């Protein structure tokens, strides 16, 4: 990629941000040297890695801090048999510990193929970690636990040092010696314990003079009684040094034996640091993975330049390459034209570097082989060239190298010279680039280019909207609408004499007046289209609310009807059973009476009556059973459109609107309502002839239930909040809302996490995300509901 283009599009500023976010030295070096790729497969692969990492971070939180140095030179030394120094060993130990921590962090990678493969490359060398931990406290301090021999040597050194200290303490407490000392203390020079002796009493304290004060008044003497002990300590110190060297060599050899797996783990950690750095940046910027293509298509939705403050950036929608290849943007200065150029160019560079873009899901970018940008006039200052010459030098280079796989971004094309010649030159350059198949976005002040864009095939106009009432740009990009200078309107609003304004209007050419009128008409049509779209969306929401309300009411009605039917059947059964019980008791009493009277004929007659009653009860019971079963078994054969039917669940008659599908579902119109029912829920209306009725179609619109678009649960416990959110989601779903917002605040994140865990299991929730700029960011969760 052209280095001038990278700088002009501020690509270097983004990778510098990522470099500072990365924790490991190798990852920082990666971002420092990162340049966009042109290989579609490599770019797609890198974006997929970042996508996995992004989703994992959202689900399981941020990863451990991967702060480590490049250990490859140290590993190479160990393989050659060299002894590593403590710092090198500790850095290798740090990598091994981070490998273990990352393996733990990546415990839930079953559905994340890339992260699962990375986890398998991370080693768990507890033996090496343990050996390093028991050896070093810091790079400069080796622990006694490093080896038993080292502990033994150091114990002897400490014992001898204590012996010297005891001897010296004994001397400074001796009144005979105290008068020879400058102070009754033990001083340290180098590693020696010494006494501060007055110079005039040099011969009174026998020993070796190791140092003296700046004035010469004090001599620092090691008494002879301590010299022999000091010599023993010196020997032990040498032994200590040799033992430490042996320990370092031992650990170096241990590392060398695992060199290959440590190297594999190191590379995995570096790659994880890189992709998670990109993922965390994407999370902070609310960025998304772009859809990539090689066919020259750009389609950005709500694109936000990452270097503009979140509360000030205005999202833009821009597309190129499908209906047109050259987009000419006109409009006032500081209206957002240059920002639009930079946004498109920067997003292409970020995408081709495997970095998400701050735009909505579904945004699409082409992988260009070349990207050129002529923005600003820095070269004119450095090289003492005019603005026009500096721009032209860049454009000459662009026209020489551009082809059908090139994106060209031109800011104020043709500026800095005579307007007529500049406009003519701009037309020729744009036409030339278009014929070469390049994709071009250019900004200009020249009105002639607006007409040129309307006349040329594969060209399109665009403008940055300007509010003439507030005299401020809105920064919205309007594709298909040429820009207006608004000079006369602005001047009039600012208070310029009306006579002057009208005089100026008279100097305008008829061509300019006609163009301004056409642009004004186009703007009016655009506003009307936006209003119609808004109305259509409102009607759509109302229709969805109607459908949801109807489905809910139908469900409630069917449930209640089934409950009543079952209750009636149960009551009928109870009556039959009760009657049977009472009759049985009655016959028992009559039988006893007949037996007492010894009337056989009466007894025989009673038995016959009993059997008649039993047959009657059985008949009634069978009728109840058949009545219940008939509601679910009776269906219609040879159903026809317009046929009159009875719908059991609604206890109403209607007409067939559509024939049953493969599952037996059909539409029936009852009055003004059209309902979806199953074939098992309808029956033929008896006594009807074969006449097919014509069904009048009517539209029904009801008002949406009064449900707020958001719910605030800040300050509530997780349990209380979830209960409220559950009820709210049911109401919102019933009302047909497509998107709602849950306000939980940032705080410690506990309430946010509890709500999100609940949302993952909720039957009405399609997806959810953090709020964007202006929505509340991480203090809210935006929920998309299912249809």
From Swiss-Prot:
One GO BP: negative regulation of DNA recombination
UniProtKB keywords: ATP-binding, DNA-binding, Endonuclease, Hydrolase, Nuclease, Nucleotide-binding, RNA-binding, rRNA-binding
Function: Endonuclease that is involved in the suppression of homologous recombination and thus may have a key role in the control of bacterial genetic diversity.
EC nos: 3.1.-.-, 3.6.4.-
PANTHER family listed in its UniProt record: OS10G0509000 PROTEIN, OS10G0509000 PROTEIN-RELATED
Enzyme class label: hydrolase
Phylogenetic classification of the source organism: Bacteria, Bacillati, Bacillota, Bacillota incertae sedis, Caldicellulosiruptorales
Name of the molecule in the record: Endonuclease MutS2
Subunit structure: Homodimer. Binds to stalled ribosomes, contacting rRNA.
GO molecular function terms listed in the Swiss-Prot or TrEMBL record: ATP binding; ATP hydrolysis activity; ATP-dependent DNA damage sensor activity; endonuclease activity; mismatched DNA binding; ribosomal large subunit binding; rRNA binding
Binding residue positions for ATP: 331-338
Keyword Hydrolase: yes
Cysteine pairs bridged by disulfides in the record: none
Keyword ATP-binding: yes
HAMAP family found in the cross-reference section: MutS2 (MF_00092)
Family label: Belongs to the DNA mismatch repair MutS family. MutS2 subfamily.
Pfam family, one: Smr
CDD domains: ABC_MutS2, ATP-synt_Fo_b
Domain Smr: 711-786
InterPro entries per the UniProt record, alphabetical: DNA_mismatch_repair_MutS_C, DNA_mismatch_repair_MutS_core, DNA_mismatch_repair_MutS_sf, MSSS, MutS, MutS2, P-loop_NTPase, Smr_dom
């Amino acid at each position: 990629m052209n280095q001038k283009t990278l700088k002009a599009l501020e690509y270097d500023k983004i990778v510098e941000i990522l470099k500072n976010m990365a924790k490991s030295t190798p990852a920082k070096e990666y971002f420092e040297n990162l340049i966009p790729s042109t290989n579609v497969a490599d770019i797609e692969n890198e974006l997929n890695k970042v996508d996995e990492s992004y989703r994992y971070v959202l689900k399981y939180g941020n990863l451990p801090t991967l702060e480590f140095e490049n250990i490859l030179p140290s590993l190479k030394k160990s393989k050659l048999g060299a002894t590593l120094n403590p710092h090198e060993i500790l850095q290798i130990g740090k990598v091994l510990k981070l490998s273990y921590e990352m393996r733990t962090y990546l415990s839930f990678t079953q559905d994340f193929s890339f992260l699962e493969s990375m986890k398998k490359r991370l080693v768990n060398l507890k033996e090496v970690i343990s050996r390093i931990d028991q050896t070093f406290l810091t790079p400069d301090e080796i622990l006694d636990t490093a080896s038993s021999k080292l502990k033994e040597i150091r114990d002897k050194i400490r014992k001898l040092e204590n012996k010297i200290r005891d001897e010296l303490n004994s001397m400074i407490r001796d009144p005979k010696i105290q008068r020879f000392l400058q102070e009754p203390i033990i001083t340290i020079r180098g590693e020696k314990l010494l006494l501060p002796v007055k110079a005039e009493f040099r011969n009174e304290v026998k020993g070796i003079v190791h140092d003296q004060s700046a004035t010469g008044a004090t001599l620092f003497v090691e008494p002879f009684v301590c010299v022999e002990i000091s010599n023993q300590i010196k020997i032990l110190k040498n032994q200590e040094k040799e033992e430490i060297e042996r320990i370092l060599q031992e650990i170096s050899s241990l590392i060398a034996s695992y060199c290959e797996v440590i190297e594999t783990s190191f590379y995995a950690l570096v790659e994880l640091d890189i992709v998670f750095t990109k993922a965390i940046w994407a999370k902070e910027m609310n960025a998304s993975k772009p859809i990539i293509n090689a066919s020259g298509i750009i389609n950005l939705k709500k694109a936000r330049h990452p270097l503009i403050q979140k509360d000030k950036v205005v999202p833009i929608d821009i597309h190129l390459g499908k209906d047109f290849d050259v987009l000419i943007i006109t409009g006032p200065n500081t209206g957002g034209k240059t920002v639009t150029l930079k946004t498109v160019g920067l997003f292409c560079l970020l995408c081709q570097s495997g970095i998400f873009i701050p735009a909505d899901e579904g945004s699409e970018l082409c992988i260009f082989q070349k990207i050129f940008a002529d923005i600003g006039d820095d070269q004119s200052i450095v090289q003492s060239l005019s603005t026009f010459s500096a721009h032209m030098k860049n454009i000459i280079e662009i026209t020489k190298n551009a082809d059908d796989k090139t994106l060209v971004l031109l800011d104020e094309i043709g500026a800095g010279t005579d307007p007529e010649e500049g406009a003519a030159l701009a037309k020729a350059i744009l036409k030339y680039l278009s014929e070469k198949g390049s994709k071009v976005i250019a900004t200009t002040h020249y009105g002639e280019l607006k007409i040129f864009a309307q006349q040329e095939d594969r060209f399109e106009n665009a403008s940055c909207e300007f509010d003439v009432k507030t005299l401020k740009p809105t920064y919205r990009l309007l594709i298909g609408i040429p820009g207006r200078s608004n000079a006369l309107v602005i001047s009039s609003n600012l208070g310029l004499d009306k006579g002057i304004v009208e005089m100026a209007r008279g100097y305008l050419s008829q061509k300019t007046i006609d163009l301004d009128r056409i642009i004004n008409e186009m703007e009016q049509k655009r506003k009307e289209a936006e209003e119609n779209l808004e109305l259509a969306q409102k009607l759509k929401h109302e229709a969805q609310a109607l459908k949801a309300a109807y489905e809910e009411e139908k469900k409630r009605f069917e449930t209640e009807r089934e409950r009543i039917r079952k209750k009636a059947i149960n009551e009928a059964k109870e009556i039959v059973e009760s009657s049977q019980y009472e009759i049985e008791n009655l016959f028992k009493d009559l039988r006893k009476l007949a037996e007492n009277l010894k009337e056989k004929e009466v007894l025989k007659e009673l038995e016959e009556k009993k059997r008649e009653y039993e047959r009657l009860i059985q008949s009634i019971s069978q009728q109840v059973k058949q009545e219940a079963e008939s509601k679910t078994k009776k269906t219609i054969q040879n159903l026809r459109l317009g046929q009159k039917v009875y719908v059991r669940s609604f206890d109403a008659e209607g007409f067939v609107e559509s024939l049953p599908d493969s599952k037996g579902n059909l539409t029936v119109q009852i009055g003004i309502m059209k309902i979806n029912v199953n074939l098992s829920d309808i029956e033929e209306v008896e006594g009807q002839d074969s006449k097919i009725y014509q069904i009048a179609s009517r539209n029904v619109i009801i008002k949406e239930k009064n449900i707020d678009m958001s719910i605030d649960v800040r300050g509530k416990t997780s349990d209380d909040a979830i209960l409220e959110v559950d009820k709210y989601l049911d109401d919102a779903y019933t009302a047909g809302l497509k998107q709602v917002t849950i306000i939980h605040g940032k705080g410690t994140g506990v309430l946010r996490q509890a709500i999100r865990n609940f949302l993952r299991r909720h039957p009405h929730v399609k997806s959810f995300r953090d709020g964007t700029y202006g929505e509340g960011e991480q203090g809210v969760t935006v929920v998309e509901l299912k249809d």
